[in-house]
């Protein structure tokens, strides 16, 4: 039941303040991640056409944030010692499907919380994919490269998500946060979108640094920068955005020793 409906019924029944509070507490919180489970069903826009072609999610980074996409390609192509790769929040497989050459002779694993997206990946790619919650999943495996685009903005525990990337990364990590660059925020500013069951967060650069240092990365092993991402600010999908993304890069000096 919507908040407005609860208030209307409360007024009709002349409930007092305590009665209204009890009604508000009964508003059901949408389960986290519901949006990524429902999109295939068409409840909030289709991901997949009838022929299996993705036209909603696929290419989000390249099409909406082309400068971030270009920067990521330069990052991964500059490394010649990557054998294992984990993509956290692979969606419907833009990189392993459209840019599969990036992972030739590499062990790639795509992970996403959305089962429809993972099913699509398995049907359209020969790489490995699993549906799981990265923060909670039971795995001790480490990867040479971990990358994640526009996912950390939506997770329910930003610090745990980032910490898990650091502890699972043997050499390199590339993380993009598209909602802006916030160097003055003391802590992350999180907003829960109950209609979708997901968060929309502004990440504190100060807090990111604190988490990285706490996880025993030295100052010369990471960078946190605000970079132009190339999004078209005159489009409806860019409402509330600045055209600047937060880019976190990790390059361990001692690699697998940590």
Q: What positions do the PLM features span?
A:
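Conserved N-terminal segment of class I S-adenosyl-L-methionine
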Residues: 1-137, 149, 246, 255-257
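A short acidic, Gly/Pro-enriched loop at the edge of an enzyme's catalytic core
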Residues: 138-145
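Conserved S-adenosyl-L-methionine
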Residues: 218-230
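Core SAM-dependent methyltransferase catalytic element
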Residues: 228-258
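Conserved class I S-adenosyl-L-methionine
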Residues: 174-202
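A short glycine-rich, Lys/Arg-flanked "PGG" loop and its adjoining helix->strand segment in the class I
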Residues: 160-173
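Short alpha-helix
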Residues: 198-216
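A short SAM/SAH-binding and catalytic strip from SAM-dependent methyltransferases
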Residues: 145-156
């Amino acid at each position: 039941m919507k908040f407005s409906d609860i208030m209307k019924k409360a007024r009709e029944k002349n409930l007092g303040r305590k009665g209204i509070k009890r009604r508000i507490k009964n508003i059901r919180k949408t389960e986290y991640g519901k949006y990524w489970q429902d999109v295939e069903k068409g409840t909030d826009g289709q991901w997949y056409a009838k022929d299996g072609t993705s036209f909603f999610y696929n290419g989000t980074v390249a099409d909406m944030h082309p400068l971030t996409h270009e920067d990521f390609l330069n990052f991964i192509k500059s490394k010649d010692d990557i054998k294992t790769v984990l993509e956290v929040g692979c969606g419907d497989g833009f990189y392993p499907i459209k840019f599969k050459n990036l992972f030739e002779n590499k062990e790639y694993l795509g992970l996403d919380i959305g089962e429809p997206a993972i099913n699509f990946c398995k049907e359209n790619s020969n790489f490995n994919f699993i549906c799981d919650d990265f923060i909670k999943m039971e795995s001790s495996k480490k990867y040479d490269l971990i990358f994640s685009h526009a996912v950390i903005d939506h997770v329910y525990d930003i610090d745990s998500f980032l910490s898990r990337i650091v502890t699972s990364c043997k050499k390199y990590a590339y993380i993009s946060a598209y909602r802006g660059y916030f160097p003055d925020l003391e802590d992350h500013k999180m907003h829960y979108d109950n209609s979708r069951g997901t968060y929309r967060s502004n990440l504190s650069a100060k807090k990111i640094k604190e988490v990285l240092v706490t996880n025993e990365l030295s100052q010369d092993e990471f960078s946190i920068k605000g970079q132009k991402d190339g999004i078209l600010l005159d489009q409806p999908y860019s409402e509330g955005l600045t055209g600047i993304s937060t880019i976190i890069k990790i390059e361990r000096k001692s690699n697998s020793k940590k």
